[in-house]
């Protein structure tokens, strides 16, 4: 009982601090200018934009727009299952209408939140499979690009625990660590940020990012 109260008090304190910081940031804005790019957005959910490695002229994003592959509607959002789309800039540096990936990356399930190696040839992404008579878990997959096409995605063997979700991959610039979200045991709260060492042979050890990053609540989208 006292542990639950302590967690709630901690989250309440973070909430109050966030409100104070928001007011401070409004009074002292940065020089960044945020603009809406109409051609990239739809009337559905569009999120998790990511450049294809070091190429600033190819943008990937997650979307539930009508062109997404799955036929079933999400029971929570009422929208189609998300897929990964990409857009390119033309010779005038204008973004083109996003198109779904023409590969096995997208399926009838949820795909999204992708991350790339610096050379743009390796892509990690989240897939949430919903199977009859089985619980739904988020999993991280990897696909390799050969030429213009992405290869058949393979599930990343990050955990031996089959009851925990892993999602929202973010590859470090050097490609030696993969950051992700998980509800696996041993964290600070519900969902925590973790990282795993990426080696030539696959994956190494898993680390929790600790109390400096994680709280008793949920952390997502590293």
Task: Locate predicted features.
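Short, conserved micro-motifs composed of acidic
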Residues: 3-222
């Amino acid at each position: 009982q006292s542990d639950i109260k302590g967690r709630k008090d901690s989250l309440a304190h973070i909430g109050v601090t966030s409100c104070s910081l928001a007011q401070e940031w409004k009074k002292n804005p940065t020089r960044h200018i945020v603009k809406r790019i109409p051609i990239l957005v739809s009337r559905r959910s569009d999120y998790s934009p990511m450049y294809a490695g070091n190429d600033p002229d190819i943008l990937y994003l997650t979307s539930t727009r009508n062109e997404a592959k799955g036929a079933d509607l999400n029971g929570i959002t009422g929208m189609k299952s998300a897929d990964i789309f990409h857009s390119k800039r033309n010779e005038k540096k204008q973004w083109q209408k996003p198109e779904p990936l023409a590969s096995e990356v997208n399926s009838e399930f949820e795909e999204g939140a992708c991350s790339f190696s610096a050379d743009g040839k390796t892509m990690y992404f989240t897939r949430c499979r919903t199977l009859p008579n089985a619980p739904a878990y988020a999993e991280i997959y990897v696909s390799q690009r050969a030429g213009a096409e992405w290869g058949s995605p393979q599930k990343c063997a990050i955990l031996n625990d089959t009851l925990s979700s892993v999602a929202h991959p973010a590859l470090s610039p050097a490609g030696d660590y993969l950051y992700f979200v998980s509800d696996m045991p041993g964290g600070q709260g519900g969902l925590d940020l973790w990282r795993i060492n990426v080696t030539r042979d696959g994956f190494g050890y898993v680390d929790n990012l600790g109390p400096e990053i994680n709280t008793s609540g949920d952390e997502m989208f590293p």
